Design a protein with these regions (language model features):
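The feature marks the mature, well-folded catalytic cores of soluble enzymes
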Residues: 1-187
Length: 187
């Protein structure tokens, strides 16, 4: 893959985040990191923000066929190097026990409807509280579906929904979606 990008001659950046192989709640990046808005992301702090975790973060820079590898201290440091200086909203809030528990329940996995508009599990109460503290209005899915709440009246929001079987199987809000054709985001 790297050679393919190098053959294109334009500038490319690839960030590789090593993930734990166990438990299964770390199956892919969406389980520890999700873009919420142009300036904010949902992050599982022990893996995405901390240094010396034992899991490598590699920034691969490809420019005019030249390939350079840079080891970064953490994932958000790597995103900052490529022009995305993100403010993290912490999965599970500031408490390490809640972070671990809510990450296990797909607390970092959200489906983005648009800029600052996301869907996620209501069960991750500390994560939802962290989103609310970061300026996201909290809307219940049943209120949106019944017409009691209008999503369009909110600039930034998280729609929370109840679920039991999908989280038990290890899936998050994004895991339930099929590809969505969206308009290009000019970041």
């Amino acid at each position: 893959m790297i050679q393919y990008f190098a053959s294109r001659k334009d500038r490319q950046h690839i960030i590789v985040q090593e993930l734990p192989t166990k438990p299964e709640s770390f199956i892919h990046l969406d389980m520890v990191f999700t873009m919420l808005a142009q300036d904010k992301c949902m992050a599982y702090s022990p893996l995405i923000l901390q240094s010396n975790t034992g899991f490598n973060t590699t920034h691969i820079e490809i420019d005019n066929g030249q390939i350079r590898y840079h080891e970064r201290n953490n994932f958000l440091e790597a995103t900052k190097h490529v022009g995305f200086d993100l403010e993290p909203v912490l999965c599970g809030g500031n408490d390490s026990w809640y972070q671990q528990r809510e990450q296990w329940h797909s607390g970092a996995n959200f489906f983005a409807l648009g800029e600052g508009k996301v869907l996620g599990y209501a069960r991750n109460t500390h994560t939802i509280e962290a989103l609310n503290n970061a300026g996201f209005d909290v809307l219940k899915a049943e209120d949106v579906c019944s017409g009691k709440e209008d999503m369009h009246a909110h600039e930034r929001f998280v729609v929370t929904f109840e679920a039991a079987e999908l989280p038990r199987g290890g899936g998050g809000a994004r895991c339930m979606t099929m590809p969505v054709k969206r308009q290009k985001v000019n970041w």
